[in-house]
Amino acid sequence: MDQPTNCEHIDNIKELTLPKDYVCEECIKTGDEWVHLRTCQTCGATLCCDASPNMHMTKHNHKTHHPVIISAEPGEQWMYCYPHDLFIDYE
């Protein structure tokens, strides 16, 4: 079966929420480091990725069930839907 190219969670995003700062909002509180950052498209939180020791964005998803994130990395233009395990590139 082919993987869908979009889902209702991604279709519901009318305007991207971009990161306000290039820091993990949780790691910065404890002085921890991160590898890459992601921005939640529901609430705008910018948190660290799964390659980072604390995996704050996945923890955020488990707690809030906010479905879609974007990469906050300069030059990267993709989003990810947690419920559908779906990556989508955008322009």
Spans of model-derived segments:
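Cys/His-rich, Zn2+-coordinating zinc-finger modules
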Residues: 3-13, 19-25, 30, 46-91
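Canonical RING-type zinc finger of E3 ubiquitin-protein ligases
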Residues: 32-41
